[in-house]
UniProtKB/Swiss-Prot annotation:
Name of the protein described by the UniProt record: Ribose import permease protein RbsC
Membrane-topology descriptor: Multi-pass membrane protein
GO cellular component: a single term: plasma membrane
Signal peptide: none
Entry-linked InterPro entries: ABC_transp_permease
Gene it is expressed from: rbsC
Biological source species: Bacillus subtilis (strain 168)
Pfam families: BPD_transp_2
Gene Ontology molecular function: any one: transmembrane transporter activity
Main localization category: membrane
PANTHER family, sorted: ABC TRANSPORTER PERMEASE PROTEIN YPHD-RELATED-RELATED, RIBOSE IMPORT PERMEASE PROTEIN RBSC
Compartments where found: Cell membrane
Protein function: Part of the ABC transporter complex RbsABC involved in ribose import. Probably responsible for the translocation of the substrate across the membrane.
């Protein structure tokens, strides 16, 4: 009897593991079929390219959020970091700074802002939710102070900067290429390096990781810095695409990123998840947004639908963790 129970439990664990890996792919496949049936224009090449451009920004933010959530943390400030770094990049370009240098400096600033989050959480012993909620408010305020609440325009006609957010390379949107390159680098970092193994170890059992010699504080600060850097990179892409910096940019982007991570199978309790799943989650959110737009659904109802999807994803995560 005990042997049968053990075999049944092993089968259940195996099934749960398979569903964790294949579930996001299956969800995306079903969603694409439904949207395609309701509006065949969804699969037109022009719309697919537009979809890839749209998901790039959320993709970059969600990749950083994946590392954060894998440690059992959360970062509510990513949208505010995007807005502040976007404004600073635009301001530098208007002041005559070379766009490439401005983007690099913007990413460094984003990493520093993320580092502040990491230090508040590790050295300040603050809960990630509270710490990043506070910095989100501060960064939003600094953005409004810097821009005086007005968009920053007059970014010039630099070809390279325009290409960064709106251009194509071999027929593929440059933002999508940027997202894919970031994905490859981060996949290697997470799955093929000691840093990635330490990230999983901290999320699985932080006390055990500390006892085993992992420098938890350093790893966490680096992870939040990485999340800030990727948010700033996303902000630079948005600035290029809009050819301006909006003081309200990035609002609710943190929710889309968290939704993508959870839909991709990463556990909110940490220690379990894959960046491949996050990429699929990003495509699910993007397909949902794009499909609802094609169907002419009001933006108000879109928020309701997105909220329901996030709720379902969290409930499924809790069920798996139980």
């Amino acid at each position: 009897m005990k042997t049968e129970q053990l075999q049944t439990e092993q089968k259940r664990i195996h099934f749960d593991g398979v569903m964790q890996k294949l579930g996001p792919f299956l969800g995306l496949f079903i969603l694409v079929i439904i949207v395609s049936i309701l509006n065949p224009s969804f699969l037109e090449p022009l719309n697919i390219l537009n979809l890839l451009r749209q998901v790039a920004i959320n993709g970059l933010i969600a990749f950083g959020m994946t590392f954060v959530i894998l440690t059992g943390g959360i970062d509510l400030s990513v949208g505010a970091i995007l807005a502040l770094s976007s404004a600073l990049v635009a301001g530098m370009i208007v002041s005559g700074v070379d766009p490439v240098l401005a983007i690099i400096l913007g990413c460094i600033i984003g990493a520093v802002l993320g580092m502040i989050n990491g230090l508040l959480i590790t050295k300040g012993k603050m809960a990630p939710f509270i710490a990043t909620l506070a910095t989100m408010t501060v960064f939003r305020g600094l953005t409004l102070v810097y821009t005086d609440g007005n968009p920053i325009t007059g970014l010039g006609t630099n070809y390279g900067f325009q290409m960064f957010g709106r251009g194509y390379f071999l027929g593929i949107p440059v933002p999508a290429i940027t997202m894919v390159l970031a994905f490859v680098i981060l996949w290697v970092l997470l799955h093929k390096t000691p840093f990635g193994r330490r990230t999983y170890a901290i999320g699985g059992n932080e006390k055990a990781a500390l006892i085993s010699g992992i420098k938890v504080t350093r790893v966490k600060v680096m992870i939040y810095s990485l999340a800030g850097l990727l948010s700033a990179l996303a902000g630079a892409i948005l600035t290029s695409r809009l050819h301006s910096a909006q003081p309200t940019a990035g609002e609710s982007y943190e929710l889309d990123a968290i939704a993508a991570v959870v839909l991709g199978g990463t556990s909110l309790s940490g220690g379990r998840g894959r960046i491949v799943g996050t990429l699929i989650g990003v495509l699910i959110i993007g397909t949902l947004n794009n499909g609802l737009n094609l169907l002419g659904v009001s933006s108000f109802y879109q928020l309701v639908v997105k909220g329901i999807v996030i709720l379902i994803a969290v409930l499924l995560d809790r069920k798996k963790s139980a």
